[in-house]
Amino acid sequence: GGSVPCIETCVWTGCFLVPGCSCKSDKKCYLN
């Protein structure tokens, strides 16, 4: 634990820094 794999925020584009993350409605990226 302790790590946050999806650290990006997103508006119109997807999430690129960590594979397997997607943009959610709160404009943050989460693991699928």
From Swiss-Prot:
Cysteine disulfide partners in this protein: 6-21, 10-23, 15-29
Record key words, sorted: Disulfide bond, Knottin, Plant defense
Post-translational modification: This is a cyclic peptide.
InterPro entries tied to this protein: Cyclotide
GO process annotations (BP): defense response
Covalent link (Cyclopeptide (Gly-Asn)) residue numbers: 1-32
Domain notes: The presence of a 'disulfide through disulfide knot' structurally defines this protein as a knottin.
Similarity comment text for this entry: Belongs to the cyclotide family. Bracelet subfamily.
Job description of the protein: Probably participates in a plant defense mechanism.
Name recorded for this polypeptide: Cyclotide glopa B
Lineage summary: Eukaryota, Viridiplantae, Streptophyta, Embryophyta, Tracheophyta
